[in-house]
Amino acid sequence: MLKVNYQRLDCPECPNGYNKGETVEWKVGYELTGIPSARNNKPAEDGGDVNGWQVKSPKASLTGRDNCDGYIFGFADANFFYQMSKEEFESFIEEFSYIDRDSRTGRQKVRIKSDSKKMREWLQARA
């Protein structure tokens, strides 16, 4: 099982006024199905939306992020970002579940199980 690190990519051109390029860890877990919007910075239980997520592995990250023109999905390592379709992205996710909140930050933690063999094969085919 891998932990999901929720992140937001901010953009000054957007009406929300966030800082471009600033990456902020999200405050609450959210389902990986569908494409959430970037309306605000409220936790999901308060009507907010997650607008970025990242599935970390030892060598690379399976990433979904908002580039202000809509979502792009891909597989990133230290040097490259390989774009993929939403369907390909979701095909790597085998299991998703919420776990308890972080006692220090109060943030909701989530846990996912991903198909690491499939992730490696996908990346190797494009490297």
Would you name each region that the model predicts?
Residues 1-127:
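Nucleic-acid endonuclease domains
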